[in-house]
Amino acid sequence: MFQHISGVINDETKRLRFQVEKVLQMSMFDRQKATLKMKEIDANELISGVINTFALKVERYNGKITSNLEAADPVIFADEMHLTNVIFNLMDNAVKYKKAEEDLELKVRTWNESGKLMISIQDNGIGIKKENLKKIFEKFYRVHTGNLHDVKGFGLGLAYVRKIILDHKGTIRAESDL
């Protein structure tokens, strides 16, 4: 248990450093592409690290994370810090917008398709209405949830996620059952 907690502390310290870098990068958001430090990264390992960091947070909500990291070719040329922040942000949103009356179920999956790495992060949260779904990646856009969720923010998280994915020549989309 101590080793797990110490690993989480180490990961969180690293992530905090990444967050500071993210804030600095966001200041350049409109001006140009983010400065990416590209290198070969095993996406399965990176995602496993984020899942490990998130495990305690999810357990606090009686939740569980299921991972199927099935990508046979998980190595990509990417910026480790920004990709970590993208995965963290998406998983963090799943926790923030969970249904109050249900235990959180978070499913993370990787696979290869047509020579590309695919990543899916799925949850059983409150969902997003169709009319809001197409706007969630816009800068400063926030879906109004009334007083149901005490979630603070500026509507930058998913805009950052989209920017980083696009700067990596990738695509991102969101789906909801609402």
Sequence positions of predicted segments:
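Conserved catalytic submotifs in the C-terminal HATPase_c
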Residues: K37-D42, E59, K64-P74
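Short helix-loop "hinge" at the ATP-lid/N-box region of the Bergerat-fold HATPase_c
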Residues: A94-V95
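Short beta-strand/loop element within the Bergerat-fold HATPase_c
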Residues: D103-G115
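Conserved micro-motifs of the catalytic ATP-binding
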Residues: R31-L36, V75-A78
